[in-house]
From Swiss-Prot:
Belongs to the LanC-like protein family. It comes from the Eukaryota. GO terms for cellular component: plasma membrane. GO terms for biological process: carbohydrate metabolic process; peptide modification. The lineage of its organism: Eukaryota, Metazoa, Ecdysozoa, Arthropoda, Hexapoda. CDD domains: euk_LANCL. Pfam families: LANC_like. This is LanC-like protein 3 homolog.
Amino acid sequence: MERRYLKNPFQDFIGGENTAFASDEEHIKNLICTYVDTILEHCHPNSDDEDDRGDLYVGNAGIAFMFWKLASCEQTRDLYPPALQHASAFIRNAKANAERFKKRSAERYSFLCGNAGIYAVSAAISQAVKDTEELSNDLANFKSGIPSSKEFIHTKNGCDEVLVGRAGYLSGCYWLNDVLPDKKITDDDLISICQLIVTSGREYSKMNNSPLPLMFQYHGTEYLGAAHGLCAILHMLLDSPWFRTVPISAPAAELREIKRSIDYFLVLQDAEGNFPVALEDLRSGRDKRLVHWCHGAPGAVYMLAKAYLIFKEEKYLTSLRRSADLVWKKGFLRKGPGICHGVAGNGYVFLLLFRLTNEMKYLYRAHKFMELLTNSEFKQRARIPDNPHSLYEGVAGTVCFLVDILEPEQAYFPFMDVFH
């Protein structure tokens, strides 16, 4: 069976060398333009394709986010002057598709794969183009997810994870509060959602005799990774107003359960630095270790970084370094250039570590992941994703990664900024 990753073709950073990346800037900008031109050639915002959900994950809202990011970054806003026009066109189409799903309560708080993400990105674009009426409508539609997220403690298939659940909705709330000039989502609303997530995890854990104080399931599987599982849910709890004060304002029981769940997760890290896909893998003895943002260490790093920033315990930084070393060894994925399970998503690990430690080794490694995108072996052996131009599977996400390499001090994986 062919390996999931390419052998790392690069020499690692040599300590003490004076590495300059200025020569990469023109190459990165040219690569951005190439990817953007490809997206515009193959993706049309006025398409009437009924199969186009329009969501952030693989739909037009994700492409709109990419154009918004291009327009928001000092290094790239002049590179593509019509970026906001394209962002507006793609988000209009996404919102037209969202109308078909408005009556579904779960869609209102589904962020990456539902209506909530569409309206969040639209709000940011409306703010950028100074359309106050549309901004008001977008925020009203987005905020309709607050009561919808509280209708149930549990659902049959799970309602807490990042792609379609409450943790994802929280990530959208935090992002909007960061990018809009006034705080649009109140602390009370954020805390009420966090409280419900904790209650859900606590009750599920007790009902299923879980070894963790908080545990969750998605379609019957107790996932641990960022897309559907525990680590991203814990990350969003750590991002809450509970942990933005000194001392921490989380209730004692919630603080204890969150911290113990993080520490249990930490001991699951294997000798290579990776984490299991699901708790079931430990029980069954399956050795399915993936090095993706969605499953594995590349997605776990954001929760670990947030835990390190809050609790200041060295064990979290040690775990982060081990995760990064694993990604450097086995993270040059053949599944494509995307951020969910591709090269750009794994490259983001090093931008995170660079911001956290200010060590040039990690910025050097991020640049090498950028270089792989034009590597002849990668171009020959990488697979074409199902949605090759999208934000999470395709090159729209790659563009975001490249933009962030140009401004590494502000870099963040989409909707998972641990430093805000």
